C-alpha cells in the first residue's frame, strides 16, 4: 500500500514536475460495422464508438477530480480503416474519414486514430483506397489521424509502401499549406507498429484486440529530470537505479488511472505505455534529462548512450510496476514538442542524422521534424527507409513523422501550436537517393526473422 511519504511525493510530482496522464485512449473494434451501404457503414461506426466513447471525457474528468492528477487528453483509436474499405470506392472511403471526425467532435475527444493501412507485405484494395485519400481526409478534418505500417521484422520492408508514403506526406503538406503543412503532424509511417499504442498520431486498434479496450500513456520527463538533478555526483549505475525507481512510481499512477477508467466504462483494461513523452512546457523535456546527466547539449557525443540508459531504466522500473506494459514504452524524442531538442537544433548540436542514431535505442523514431518544403519526395522516402531499417533489423518499433513545410527553408521557424509546439526547420542531405528508392519492391526480412 501507499505510505504518507509516497503520497506527498506524488503530489510534488504533479504540482512541480509536470507529472500527468498524457492520454486515456479507448480502442474500438470496427470489424462488425461494415455494411453493403457506405451510409449504413458510417452510421454503424459512429454508433459503435458512441456506445462507450460518449462517457470517455466525463470519465477522465471524474478521475481527475478523484485522484487530483491531470489527464491531458481523452482519445479514441479504431480498427485500421483499410480493413473496412475494400468493398468501397475512394470517394466512399473519404466518407468514413468524415464519420470519424463527426463522432470525435460529438463525444469531445481531441484526436481519433486509425485512418490507417498495414502494407508491410503488399497492398489490398482497401489499403489503396485509404492511402489515396489520406491527404484529403487530413486536410478536411481536424481530429482524424493516419498511420501506415510499411515494414515488420518478419516481413521485411515494402519499398513501394515507403515511396507511396513519401508522396502522401508531400501531398498532405501542400493541401495544408495555409497551416505550414500541419496535416503531416497527423501521419506516422511505422515499422513494427504496435496494436495497442495509446499515443497519437500513430494509434490504431489491432485486430487481435477486444471490442473495447482502455490503454493509458503517462508523461513524466520533468519528474525524471528532477531526480537526475538531485544526484549530480552519482555514477551511471546509481543514476540508472534512481531513474528506474522513479519510473516505477510514475507507472503505478498510470495503471491505477487506467484500471479505474476501464472499470467505470465497463470495458477491458489494456496496457500502460511507459514512454516519457515531452511537451513544449518548461522543464517537461527529454533533452533536458540528457543534459542534466552531464552533456552540454542533447546531440553532443554520448547522447545515444545517455538515451539508451534512460530508456532501459524506464522500462525496467515500469515493468516492475505493471504486468500490463505495451504500446511504444521508452522515450519519445519529438523535436517540435521538446524545447530542449529545439535549442539543440538551434545551436547545431542536433541534426537528422544524430536523431536517427538516437532512435536505435529509444521508443519511436524521427518525430515532429520540420524540413524544407522543397525537399524531393525521393529524399523523404530515403529518410523513411533509413529509419524503418533500424526498426526492422533490431526487432523494434520505429516511425517517422516528418513535415515538409511549404515555402520555408532550413533555419526558418514554424509554429504548430499547442502540444505540437514550434521548431526550427532542419536541413536535409542534399545528395540524391532517387535511383535507389525508385527500384521499389521489397527489402527481404533479416535473418533474425527466422525464429521458429
Swiss-Prot record:
Pfam families linked to this entry: DUF711 (PF05167)
InterPro entries with a match to the protein in the record: UPF0210
The organism's place on the tree of life at top rank: Bacteria
Matching CDD domains: RNR_PFL_like_DUF711
UniProt subunit comment: Homodimer.
Recorded family membership: Belongs to the UPF0210 family.
Protein name, UniProt field: UPF0210 protein CHY_1509
Species the sequence originates in: Carboxydothermus hydrogenoformans (strain ATCC BAA-161 / DSM 6008 / Z-2901)
